[in-house]
């Protein structure tokens, strides 16, 4: 028991330290790193939603970017003002943020009957179709979306406080002037922490165990009284809501929305994040988002200092191509040597360190166990300790 409590306390202390570091980073980071951090926190929320769907519930999705696009454009339309080229609802930004998640969740709920009838690669192909359908709508419904060029996004404001460089136009903390990027950093940090906390509770609770049973065996889950169709629908709704919120945050970080931002490549990027981080791991999804999102931005920023990189269009190895190569090598390395991703590797290191220490007593029964890749294990009937002759 003491070993279990010690592990939990170490995790909580480590999480608290990370939060404190994140709170102080805007005081020392440049605008480039602040912007990169905004992108990372936004994509991390999308990756967390996808790891619940793919890692915990076992439902393959190649259309996560479509739900993010819905959230981004719903936010842009709902908070924007009508002009001669595009329409807008003029709602408060907070209402637009909530509406982005809700509308994406409703689209996920509408798709859930399809998810209930398909599985595996067939479900993945069905979700892939969403990417092309949504892109077609974004390009052609130009009165609402702005067409190929997209539309601008209103800055976030809450209670008269603007998260841009105005109202108040000057705000300083510890001698550091807090401009729009600094203010958005704390907004995104709060949203990311709440989203990860909710996902962790879902993953370890009754809902997560139901999803895990459906992932492992739909027949066995139905025999245990779990509504398979209801479980699939619920995880699609939750995952879509996370993607919609991530899309709205990306719209705020970019200051503009365009169809090319939410292409098939973006869906693949989300999958790479959760595979590298570890399927079913909330923390792993965050780490994967950090790696996949920050790498191309960092390579582009410092391409002039890296001799093996060339400027885009010059015929050499540009930062985007280099990032794709690194992603591919990283995925191969994870699949071959790090089963369970980075989260699984960290978990094995903790287990080795705990085994090297003297035992504190018999290990308690953990009703929320995990499998060897860190996903919530399905609930299975216990076997009798007696053997038959």
Task: Please tell me what each predicted stretch does.
Residues 1-389:
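Transmembrane alpha-helices and adjacent helix-loop boundaries
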């Amino acid at each position: 028991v003491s070993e279990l409590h010690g592990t939990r306390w170490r995790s909580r202390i480590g999480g608290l330290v990370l939060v404190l570091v994140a709170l102080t980073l805007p005081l020392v980071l440049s605008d480039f790193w602040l912007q990169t951090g905004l992108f990372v926190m936004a994509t991390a929320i999308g990756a967390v939603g996808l790891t619940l769907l793919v890692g915990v519930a076992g439902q393959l999705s190649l259309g996560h970017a479509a739900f993010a696009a819905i959230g981004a454009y719903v936010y842009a339309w709902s908070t924007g003002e009508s002009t001669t080229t595009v329409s807008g609802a003029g709602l408060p930004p907070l209402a637009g943020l909530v509406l982005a998640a809700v509308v994406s969740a409703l689209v996920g709920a509408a798709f859930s009957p399809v998810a209930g009838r398909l599985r595996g690669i067939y479900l993945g192909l069905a979700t892939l179709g969403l990417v092309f359908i949504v892109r077609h709508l974004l390009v052609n419904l130009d009165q609402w979306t702005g067409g190929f060029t997209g539309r601008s996004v209103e800055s976030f404001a809450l209670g008269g406080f603007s998260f841009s460089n105005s109202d108040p136009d000057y705000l300083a903390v510890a001698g550091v002037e807090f401009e729009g990027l600094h203010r958005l950093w704390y907004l995104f940090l709060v949203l990311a922490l709440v989203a990860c906390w909710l996902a962790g509770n879902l993953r370890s609770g009754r809902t997560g165990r139901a999803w895990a049973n459906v992932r492992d065996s739909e027949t066995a889950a139905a025999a245990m009284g779990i509504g398979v169709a209801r479980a699939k629908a619920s995880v699609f709704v939750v995952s879509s809501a996370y993607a919609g919120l991530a899309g709205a945050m990306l719209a705020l970080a970019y200051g503009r929305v365009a169809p090319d931002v939410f292409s098939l490549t973006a869906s693949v990027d989300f999958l790479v994040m959760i595979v590298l981080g570890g399927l079913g791991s909330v923390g792993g999804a965050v780490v994967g988002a950090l790696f996949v999102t920050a790498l191309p931005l960092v390579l582009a920023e410092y391409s002039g200092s890296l001799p093996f990189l060339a400027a885009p269009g010059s015929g050499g190895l540009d930062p985007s191509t280099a990032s794709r190569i690194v992603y591919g090598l990283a995925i191969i390395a994870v699949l071959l040597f790090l089963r369970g991703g980075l989260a699984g590797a960290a978990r094995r290191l903790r287990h080795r360190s705990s085994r090297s220490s003297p035992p504190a007593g018999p290990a308690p029964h953990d009703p929320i166990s995990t499998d060897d890749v860190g996903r919530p294990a399905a609930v299975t009937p216990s076997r009798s300790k007696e053997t038959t002759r």
